[in-house]
């Protein structure tokens, strides 16, 4: 699973998921992409599940780029803990995704294979997605 090697702060604020993605919303590396249509937090486990689906489906044929990285720690308190006594310990990592953000890019396979692979990977995502092709 993906996680940062080190961060400036252990326990970040939750923040708001307002607005659309202004960066990372265009196809840069590959020819096909999976784009988020809704705001959400995507966990490192979900990113890894999508990556496994895509790599297994395209075999050795294609190249894959993951365009998001889980750099925000989500804290959890133990079950049955009373209120107070501070914030919980970091439990898992999430990538903050705004609408329009590219999640995965792919190259080196036909459009039908890429579309099918991205469709299967989209089932692993907690958000509505859209398949994009690079326009010249």
Curated annotation (Swiss-Prot):
SUPFAM superfamilies: Ribosomal protein L16p/L10e. InterPro entries: Ribosomal_uL16, Ribosomal_uL16_bact-type, Ribosomal_uL16_CS, Ribosomal_uL16_dom, Ribosomal_uL16_sf. GO terms for molecular function: rRNA binding; structural constituent of ribosome. It is found in: Plastid, Chloroplast. Keywords: Chloroplast, Plastid, Ribonucleoprotein, Ribosomal protein. It holds the Pfam family Ribosomal_L16. PANTHER family: 50S/60S RIBOSOMAL PROTEIN L16, LARGE RIBOSOMAL SUBUNIT PROTEIN UL16M. HAMAP family: Ribosomal_uL16. This is Large ribosomal subunit protein uL16c. It comes from Chlamydomonas reinhardtii (Chlamydomonas smithii). The lineage of its organism: Eukaryota, Viridiplantae, Chlorophyta, core chlorophytes, Chlorophyceae.
